[in-house]
Amino acid sequence: MKNETPIQGHYDTSSVFVAVIGRPNVGKSSLTNLLVGEKVAIVTSKPQTTRTRITGVITRGPLQYVLLDTPGVHKPHNKLGKRMDKTASDSIADVDVSMILFKPYGALNESEMVLVEALKKGGPAIAVINKTDLVKDPADLEARKAELKALGVFDDVYTVSVRDNDHCEELFDALSRYAVEGPHYFDDDAYTDMPEKELVAEVIREKALLYMRDEIPHGIAVVVERFKERPGTDLVDIDVNIYCERESHKGMVIGKGGAMLKKIASAARTDCEEFLGCRVNLQCWVKVKADWRDNEFMLNNFGFKQQPNR
């Protein structure tokens, strides 16, 4: 739950807002989940899994960390992609520090270089090289660190392996240096500001990404139409519409005899029951909204709106 901002004065508490940014599949959501200690962002091997900014909250005594996990910076191919890219680049503004993730190998791509240019005009930033478990020669990692330091936009460069949870804890100390005295923006026991309905929608989309192939899952939007607790029981009724862009895609999402939809819904139900702490009656329907990713009205209707950082 988000707190009301009290009047200015002396506080024994402080907060640090952190934009977590990087190219697709560099490990932003995995790192956010690891640091938060809860699953606040869905994770798959497919690029552009994260579509909107996800907030993860960690409170350690008087210091509260607010991580803004952003969509991967990439060359957009539709209006949804442009909104995703803008969400990532806009997150540099109005945060206390940007944490930019990089792979340990390969040339920096065009989107990453645009991001570096934006950092020259923005606030402080640190670089984090993830996936160090893939590095065979330590000299290669040192070369990557030197390359990033030479860009002149990072206060420091850190190396981690999210997969092995190696050196990730050190990031808390690094980020704490940018904390600002003031109130905690969230309750101390909060770990995200995402409403339960949105968490449910994200879990269903995650399962579609995991179980379906190629481009089809990226053309899917999930909208929770009903979320209602049954009085006197531990059961929640959830009705969901899964939107796709083509009639042919609808058939693939449903699958032969409804097999694919049942598989997605069953896996999603298990996850939902775990984070909601109750039984879930999940009903899913598949509908077609042609080319919704290029329709401004539908993007707004499906919840893809620009979000303030605080």
Name each model feature, range by range:
Residues 59-64, 83-157, 228-232:
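Conserved C-terminal guanine-recognition region of P-loop GTPase G domains, centered on the G4
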Residues 1-97, 102:
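Conserved G1/Walker A P-loop phosphate-binding module
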Residues 38, 57-61, 76, 91, ...:
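Conserved, well-folded catalytic cores of nucleic-acid-processing
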Residues 50, 73-75, 107-108, 135-136, ...:
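Catalytic P-loop NTPase motifs of RecA-like helicase/translocase cores
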Residues 27, 167, 260:
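Conserved glycine(s) of the Walker
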Residues 196-310:
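P-loop NTP-binding site
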Residues 124-126, 133-196:
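Canonical P-loop GTPase G-domain recognition
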Residues 19, 33, 52, 56, ...:
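Solvent-exposed alpha-helical segments within well-ordered globular domains of core cellular machineries
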